[in-house]
Amino acid sequence: MHALRALDTLCENMEYNFRALEEKWAPIWERDRLFEVDENDSETPRKYVLDMFSYPSGDLHMGHAETYAYGDFIARYWRHRGYNVLHPVGWDSFGLPAENAAIKHGSDPKVWTYRNIDQQARSMRLYAASFDWSRRLHTSDPEYYRWNQWLFLKLYKHGLAYRKKAWVNWDPSDRTVLANEQVLPDGTSERSGALVVKKKLTQWFLRITAYADRLLDDLSMLENNWPERVITMQRNWIGRSEGVSIEFNIPTLKRPVTVFTTRPETIFGVTYLALAFDSEVTEELASKSGVLGELLELRHNIDKTHEGVRGLDLKSFAIHPLTGQSVPIFAASYILSDYAKGAVMSVPGHDTRDERFAVRYNLPIVKIMEDNRLISSGKYSGQSVTQARENITRDLCAKSLGRREISYRLRDWLISRQRYWGTPIPILYDSNGSEIPVEEDDLPVLLPDSEGIDLTPSGLSPLGGIHDWVNLHKAGSLFRRDTDTMDTFFDSSWYFLRYLNPDCDTAPFTLEKAKKWGPVDQYCGGVEHAVLHLLYARFITKFLYDIGFVDFKEPFLRLINQGMVVLNGAKMSKSKGNIVEFSKEVSQHGVDVIRFALIFSGPPEEDIDWKDVSMTGAARFLSRCIQTAKEVPKRTADLSLGDIELRKHTHSLLNDIDWLVDSYRFNVIAARLMDLLNITRKKIQTIGADNPAIREAIETIAIALDMFSPYTAEEMWEILGNKYSVSKALFPEVDTTFLEQKTTCAIVQIDGRLRGRLNVLTNITTEQLVHSARSLPAIEHALSGRSVKRVICVPPKLVNFVVEPK
């Protein structure tokens, strides 16, 4: 024990020399291109592990450190399980931050972007993420965005890309349009934080709504493999609603306005119609009744203030389809023009928003429901809600005043952006303004250099000011290029496929490679992309499936969302001055310590408070790993002579690693490694370091540690005299003879009531558990003469006999 305490003291006093390890191994790994996949290997099973690629806004931050630690953990795990692992790297390098930085500093967004990419690449290499650097890509490279344009043209050819004049979300700060998904619930821009206003512009859209049902239905394929909250968020965003479209005739227009409702049974409670401020019907009615100026002013002010519920009496009436009574029509700020019909039959007696509006504008409030039955509803009074819903729907349809319909919250994807740093839209316009798609042979439509371009946001596309670029003479005719650029979420909607053929110049990727590697087995990134990026990627994948470019319907089989790295409970922010700098932490503590400490801090989905991350403990553990490896003789011995107790601990860990990785309990593996090291070091004092079980334990620790701290693991592997590299080493086979058969208490029930308990092995089968339960005297007596309808068995915890009534 004295020697053990001496070694512990040595480790505690000895500085963990992370810098020497990093300087030793990083250049060797880079020289050997250790993590490039072997495309010629057709025998080894394959896995595709992908981290959400980075935006190059500066150096890496601690959020990147966490994401890459988890993604690399999983990639290395599958290599240790004998898989050929594709783990590529790239940059989402188009976008507003680069353009805004260029405006602020008077620089070129391209120079700013690629300088940051170079900085991040250096940090990533040092961080020892096991990327295949030969597949590196940047979405701002012409070799990449050429295929953005190709994909856009495919969508256009199939009627899924179209241009129309529409009310759009306008960011007055960045002076560009936003997709609905980029507007936060409080009406502000996701990126700039500015209050978003409505503006009518001619824009390009992608018809994602054509895939609404498939996007919704196929979420069932992802259950248990994606976080439930992400599936719920997507399901809610798509927002499928079954209901009825009902026509309310407007005499002054001599035509009806159509409303959509999921509650037709409330039609007798309608006391006013509410129309969206920005609908054409609203403007037409306002014009006829002389309140158009008031409407436009109110709409403008609402865009600026977003205050409460606002409305305007349009001094018009609609005819109730069942009662024939006149119903007043109002413009209301809470009605969205791009959802359902942009018109609502308002029932203030049974809807809180309608009630607030009715109270504010002194409109009637009528109750038409009591104890789940209709009242004051004509011939439908007394019917249950369910009966009335069906009967009213049937009668409206029979009179051609209504029709059954399905509505979606999901809107088509607006991809036009009035900014410079993005993919040019590959469309020309002739002298008549007709759209002409650019020929595929003429791709890419290159983004011109920014020199001489005024990038200051003006509401107009900067590309429009480059006349030599905009105007194109072809075949004796003059054409104009489209001057908008694409939403950068288009770039990231398919990037995972370009990694399969990053150098291919005849296609974005080949079906052969898509079949070989796709879909992505494990995707790692933040939950902030739950609706935007992930929904768009699913849409594009389904389109590519439809046109025969991939043979799978979902892009990402499994998804892990990590929590945030915060400081003192608050989100890190430069403006708050509470940033933890990645480069400073790496310089002070080393890569391995940071990676181990981050993963050890808790389950991936939980936030990590940096103040609680134990660097000292991680450094001490890694130092002990190396020092203990030095104690182990390099010679091999017969494992059958190894200490049985230690081998039980080692094989228990090996047995549990698979399910711990599968359930993302990486922190538990870290704790188990620390336990195994402590047990091994104590065993050295009693059985000696030359016992074969010692070497087996330390080699197992080295292989598992590679998933956390690769520099330390590689050093241990070399010290142990093993063949380079530890990243290629396979986990030892589990010897089940060393696994203890543990017991647990099983509950035995009859019709859900406790009738007995059993002490059983944890690996008991269903048949064994049912047989043992039946053999209990109390159960045997209770079941005597009774018929068992079914048996519910959840080994090793529960047996429930469901019996026929006496």
UniProtKB/Swiss-Prot annotation:
It comes from the Bacteria. GO terms for cellular component: cytoplasm. It is found in: Cytoplasm. Keywords: Aminoacyl-tRNA synthetase, ATP-binding, Cytoplasm, Ligase, Nucleotide-binding, Protein biosynthesis. A motif ('HIGH' region) lies at residues 54-64. InterPro entries: aa-tRNA-synth_I_CS, aa-tRNA-synth_Ia, Leu-tRNA-ligase, Leu_tRNA-synth_edit, M/V/L/I-tRNA-synth_anticd-bd, Methionyl/Leucyl_tRNA_Synth, Rossmann-like_a/b/a_fold, tRNAsynth_Ia_anticodon-bd. It catalyses: tRNA(Leu) + L-leucine + ATP = L-leucyl-tRNA(Leu) + AMP + diphosphate. Its EC number is 6.1.1.4. ATP binds at residue 574. The keyword Hydrolase does not apply. PANTHER family: LEUCINE--TRNA LIGASE, MITOCHONDRIAL, LEUCYL-TRNA SYNTHETASE. A motif ('KMSKS' region) lies at residues 571-575. Its main location: cytoplasm. Belongs to the class-I aminoacyl-tRNA synthetase family. This is Leucine--tRNA ligase. The gene is leuS. GO terms for biological process: leucyl-tRNA aminoacylation.
